[in-house]
Every structure is written in C-alpha cells, then in structure tokens.
Amino acid sequence: MRIKINLQCSHCGSKNYLTSKNKKNHPEKIQVPKYCPKERKVTLHIES
C-alpha cells in the first residue's frame, strides 16, 4: 500500500514536496537532496 508523504527541508523546515512511498518495502524515513526555493540551494529533505 502506497502512502502520501511530505518532504520537509532540514535547514528551514518548509514542506516543499509531496510524494508517495510503499511503507511495506521502505519502513525507514526517506532522505532526498532536493532544491529548496526558500534557501535557493539544494538541501536535504526529510520525510515528515
């Protein structure tokens, strides 16, 4: 079963991206480098 998750910037705390994941295959939190428009650079985004 896929669930919707928000990706939150680790620097400024803004929620910039909405994605989905299969909780059965990936029970751990997702960490992805993405562009943060508030910081104007690529930062680590963590599942919130």
UniProtKB/Swiss-Prot annotation:
InterPro entries: Ribosomal_bL33, Ribosomal_bL33_CS, Ribosomal_bL33_sf, Ribosomal_zn-bd. GO terms for molecular function: structural constituent of ribosome. The keyword Ribonucleoprotein applies. GO terms for cellular component: cytoplasm; ribonucleoprotein complex; ribosome. Keywords: Ribonucleoprotein, Ribosomal protein. GO terms for biological process: translation. Belongs to the bacterial ribosomal protein bL33 family. PANTHER family: 50S RIBOSOMAL PROTEIN L33, CHLOROPLASTIC, LARGE RIBOSOMAL SUBUNIT PROTEIN BL33A. This is Large ribosomal subunit protein bL33. The lineage of its organism: Bacteria, Bacillati, Bacillota, Bacilli, Lactobacillales.
